[in-house]
Amino acid sequence: MIFSTLEHILTHISFSVVSIVITIHLITLLVDEIIGLYDSLEKGMMTTFFCITGLLMTRWIYLRYLPLSNLYESLIFLSWSFSIIHMVPYFKKYKNYLKAITAPSAIFTQGFATSGLLTEMHQSEILVPALQSHWLMMHVSMMVLGYAALLCGSLLSLALLVITFRKFISIFSKSNNFVNESFSLGEIQYVREKNNLLPNTSFLSSRNYYRFQLIQQLDLWSYRIISLGFIFLTIGILSGAVWANEAWGSYWNWDPKETWAFITWTLFSIYLHTRTNKNFESVNSAIVASMGFLIIWICYFGVNLLGIGLHSYGSFTLTSN
């Protein structure tokens, strides 16, 4: 009873704090002058991290195994992973380009985990024999950490694409306006020369220079965090294969979860390969990474929604009242 009450309190505190963090972040986007709000945002995410850590530890002590056996527990761990990713740049004294992604991701996963859809999973249950293994901690924790990092990297790539295409549309629009005005004067050759100089002129402006710097930083951070997530995902898949051999007598069975995990791994392998090719532009690799956002969610939720395959533990069904 005490553990259940403490878990309930920590869940609501963490959700409330991260909601306040989102509100503070929105205020800082509108009012840049309020510097004190930036510190409040970081302290809020630290509070969220410690609350979720306390929640996981409480459930671990109560259940006597790392709480990663169903969708509810893995979502809580995913939210915890987002909070860790948020704090790494802060302690490294880097400019945090991830905070616009990690904080909303934490609140959405936390909100879904505590929603009425997963109420039945809040209660403790005895693990099925296949899950009573030390590989549970290794395999599932690495997979969820990999999902969190890859999701953040994919969202950064999506942001890069949005900013890049907005820049191209803006330049194209200005170019067309200039061409129309120049054609009315009949200066065709002059238009061609000015048209070639237009991108350079736009680049030299302070606004476009800042945008260029932002694109470069988004590209760098997406590459870093996707590389980290790919390592976690690889370790998770390999440890899962060893566990599968112990539990089912085969390293790989091509059930839905394993198939989509392989698709996810292959997609991000392609992304990392494109990064080694200097002829490949950052936009092209960002397109590959952004595709991974959808693939990860299919891999993560697909089996739980369908409730099929060898990995259907902790699946849930949507029921109407």
UniProtKB/Swiss-Prot annotation:
Keywords: Chloroplast, Cytochrome c-type biogenesis, Membrane, Plastid, Thylakoid, Transmembrane, Transmembrane helix. GO terms for molecular function: heme binding. The keyword Chloroplast applies. It is found in: Plastid, Chloroplast thylakoid membrane. GO terms for biological process: cytochrome complex assembly. InterPro entries: Cyt_c_assembly, Cyt_c_biogenesis_CcsA, Cyt_c_biogenesis_CcsA/CcmC. The chain crosses the membrane at residues 17-37, 46-63, 71-91, 98-118, 143-163, 225-245, 259-273, 286-306. GO terms for cellular component: chloroplast thylakoid membrane; plasma membrane. It is a multi-pass membrane protein. It comes from the Eukaryota. Required during biogenesis of c-type cytochromes (cytochrome c6 and cytochrome f) at the step of heme attachment. May interact with Ccs1. Belongs to the CcmF/CycK/Ccl1/NrfE/CcsA family. HAMAP family: CytC_CcsA (MF_01391). This is Cytochrome c biogenesis protein CcsA.
